[in-house]
Amino acid sequence: MRAFIVGRFQPFHNGHMEILKRILHENDSVIIGIGSAQFSHTLKDPFTAGERHLMISSALEESGVYNYYLVPIEDVNSNPLWVSHVESLTPPFQRVYTNNPLVKRLFYEKGYEVLSMDLLNRKEWSGTSIRNKMIRGENWKKDVPPAVARVIDEIDGVSRIRDLSESDE
């Protein structure tokens, strides 16, 4: 069975990795939707879809995980059309994993099996928490897979986030 999960992954962190491992324990493969793919260079969404793709693929491959598809998904300004938009971009799938109430409802109404997940260590493993640690100069690397830390270093991501945090907008 093939599953689908969508997230912003700003950045991809250890909680995401654990969730993907659980999904792959229950399914043959997973489609990972890189959500809000059109956004980057903002404090909430600092990384491009391509950078997030590199973070996720590097982390999964370093962990020996190869049964996945990565698909950038731009937002659509019409909720009833969003599932059809996702379907047009991805291989077929049977299950959806999400804790987002709107995403649950939209896929449920289209007949998908929708499952929730327990979020692990949410205080430490959240994109907001990790980005805030970067701004404050705290240790954020323990909260992301080593491959993700290397990508963020390679693209000078911490400096980007700090610059964005100083914006007056």
UniProtKB/Swiss-Prot annotation:
GO terms for molecular function: ATP binding; nicotinamide-nucleotide adenylyltransferase activity. One of its GO terms (cellular component) is cytoplasm. It is found in: Cytoplasm. The keyword Acetylation does not apply. Disulfide bonds: none annotated. It catalyses: beta-nicotinamide D-ribonucleotide + ATP + H(+) = diphosphate + NAD(+). Its EC number is 2.7.7.1. Its main location: cytoplasm. InterPro entries: Cyt_trans-like, NMN_Atrans_arc, Rossmann-like_a/b/a_fold. GO terms for biological process: NAD biosynthetic process. Signal peptide: none annotated. It is an enzyme of class 2 (transferase). Pathway: Cofactor biosynthesis; NAD(+) biosynthesis; NAD(+) from nicotinamide D-ribonucleotide: step 1/1. Belongs to the archaeal NMN adenylyltransferase family. This is Nicotinamide-nucleotide adenylyltransferase.
